[in-house]
């Protein structure tokens, strides 16, 4: 049953079901417990198994509040999909590396080369794929809507700087030689065309092929879909750019965590603490040391997630809630290393 919320935080809210105001105190309290952001306007409350409510923020962007159980199920599917495709990602990186090399030497086609560059930037710089609809509706940029004005070149490195999803500034430097050469040549070619035709290039899209056809998010996902058929364990599993970001987040988490632990182990050795640097909590001298050791592990987990969030241009809470597989965190805690 749909319930409409009317009013503002300052004036107070009223709720209507079938155009009749809800006055029952218990029912109103149940609605309040749903914790719908007071700043949302034109709120419709569904409270079904999937969606609690939806409304619009100050920029008139639709915001959906999903039911926690639905989010949990979707996350479980996402992480199970990732686990089932773990070998795929390794093979995909090899394929992308080959397509980059072929593109650079002229052995590959222009479209595949552009897509390989995009996927590399997703993995190395943490950018989202983006699409024209999101650019139009929210004035935000992703890789497929990247423009020449977002690029700066210096010392064989390219600085990419744009406003992405939810108004978050995305800044990253890429020093990959092939990526640098691809983007530098793209800018030079566009500038030459602009000079010849007296048109501006700053607002032109970077990733194009066949004389101006723009690479879309669908093109990149189709590339991944075809690769999925070849490399994934199951033909029913299709990897998308979202899956790529999830896999990248978890890979980065483990990499960062291991680096942090190595630093902590070296510090323990310098302090001359009892036991080897690799000793686990069960080897600690007493319960006090074990508790201190475990607190250190949780602190390092948090730090690793913060580093992943920064890499993916996300907040800590979003990264932990939507990107890092809880089973991986549990595994790290259980291993006590």
Segment roles from a protein language model:
Residues 1-142, 146-191, 200-247, 251-266, ...:
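A positively charged, amphipathic N-terminal helix/segment that binds anionic biomolecules
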Residues 291, 322-337:
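Catalytic-site neighborhood detector that most strongly recognizes the C-terminal catalytic loop/helix
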């Amino acid at each position: 049953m749909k319930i409409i919320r009317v009013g503002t935080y300052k004036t107070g809210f009223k709720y209507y079901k079938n155009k009749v105001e809800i006055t029952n105190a218990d029912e109103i309290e149940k609605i309040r417990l749903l914790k719908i952001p007071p700043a949302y306007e034109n709120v419709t409350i569904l409270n079904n198994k999937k969606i609690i409510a939806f409304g619009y923020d100050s920029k008139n962007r639709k915001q959906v509040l999903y039911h926690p159980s639905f989010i949990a199920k979707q996350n479980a599917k996402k992480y199970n999909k990732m686990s089932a495709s773990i070998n795929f990602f390794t093979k995909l990186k090899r394929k992308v590396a080959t397509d980059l090399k072929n593109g650079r030497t002229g052995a590959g086609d222009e479209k595949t080369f552009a897509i390989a560059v995009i996927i590399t930037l997703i993995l190395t710089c943490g950018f989202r794929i983006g699409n024209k609809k999101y650019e139009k509706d929210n004035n935000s940029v992703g890789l497929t809507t990247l423009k020449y004005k977002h690029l700066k070149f210096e010392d064989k490195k390219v600085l990419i700087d744009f406003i992405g999803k939810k108004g978050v500034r995305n800044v990253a430097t890429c020093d990959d030689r092939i990526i640098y050469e691809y983007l530098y040549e793209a800018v030079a070619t566009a500038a030459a065309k602009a000079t010849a035709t007296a048109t501006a290039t700053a607002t032109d899209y970077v990733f194009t092929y066949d004389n101006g056809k723009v690479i879309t998010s669908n093109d990149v996902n189709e590339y991944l879909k075809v690769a999925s058929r070849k490399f994934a364990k199951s033909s029913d599993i299709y990897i998308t750019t979202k899956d790529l970001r999830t896999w990248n987040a978890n890979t980065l988490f483990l990499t960062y965590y291991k680096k942090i632990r190595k630093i902590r182990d070296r510090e323990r050795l310098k302090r001359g603490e009892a036991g080897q640097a690799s000793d686990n909590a069960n080897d600690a001298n007493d319960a006090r040391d074990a508790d201190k050791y475990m607190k250190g592990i949780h602190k390092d987990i948090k730090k690793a997630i913060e580093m992943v969030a920064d890499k993916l241009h996300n907040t800590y809470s979003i990264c932990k809630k939507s990107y890092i597989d809880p089973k991986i965190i549990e595994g790290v805690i259980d291993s006590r290393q």
